Design a protein with these regions (language model features):
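Intrinsically disordered, low-complexity regulatory segments in ankyrin-centric signaling systems
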Residues: 1-23, 34-49, 53, 57, ...
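Ankyrin-repeat boundary/"N-cap" motif
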Residues: 1-5, 30-40, 65-76, 101-113, ...
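Ankyrin repeat A-helix N-terminal signature
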Residues: 7-12, 42-48, 78-84, 115-121, ...
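Alpha-helix initiation and capping sites
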Residues: 13, 26, 33, 48, ...
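Conserved ankyrin/ankyrin-like repeat signature
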Residues: 16, 50-51, 86-87, 123-124, ...
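Ankyrin repeat domain, specifically the short helix-to-loop turn at the C-terminus of the second helix
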Residues: 19-28, 53-62, 89-98, 126-134, ...
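Eukaryotic tandem repeat interaction scaffolds
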Residues: 70-73, 77-91, 97-102
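Leucine-rich solenoid repeat scaffolds
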Residues: 136-168
Length: 169
């Protein structure tokens, strides 16, 4: 379900977005079941670069906000899940944590690097390595990025990770 902010986001209508965000309240943009999503998630969902950039300039505390949905997806992980290199780069350029935010209370721990490997997206793996992603993280099942690459048979990604691990030492 799209709320007025979500409709403006989908339509890339920055003037309406600015007007809707002018008040003290932060209206939600989209809802699904019992969950609601703000403009940042919605901009990624609709692949709206200008809206995402505007929202990132408006919310400078991006890493202090807890952005993690019920599946442990942070903004960056969500962009990776959608294989959106362009928006992932924008998030990283604006300083979002390269490893995402992992709350100790989340049932699932989903890291951007793991999502890139699971999708066999070499370009996204390279982007995370460029921003020095932690290659020693473990997901909810205790799997590391290298183990996942081996498990999925992603040989090129496995080689990239091994090179990245050497550089991080």
């Amino acid at each position: 379900q799209l709320y007025p902010l979500g409709i403006a986001c989908r339509n890339n209508d920055l003037e309406t977005i600015k007007r809707l965000l002018a008040g003290k309240d932060e209206p939600m943009a989209m809802g699904h079941d019992c969950y609601e999503f703000d403009i940042l998630y919605t901009a990624i969902y609709f692949n709206k670069e200008d809206v995402l950039k505007y929202a990132l300039t408006r919310y400078k505390d991006i890493n202090d906000r807890v952005y993690s949905d019920e599946y442990g997806l942070t903004l960056l992980t969500y962009a990776y899940k959608l294989s959106n290199v362009k928006l992932a780069r924008i998030l990283l350029e604006y300083g979002i944590h390269v490893n995402g935010y992992q709350s100790p209370y989340d049932t699932y721990k989903v890291y951007p690097i793991m999502e890139a490997i699971a999708n066999n997206n070499i370009e996204l793996v390279r982007l995370l390595l460029e921003y020095h992603a932690d290659l020693n993280v473990k997901d909810s099942n205790g799997i590391t990025p290298l183990a996942l690459a081996k498990e999925t048979g992603a040989k090129e990604i496995e080689n990239l990770l091994l090179q990245g691990m050497k550089q991080q030492k």
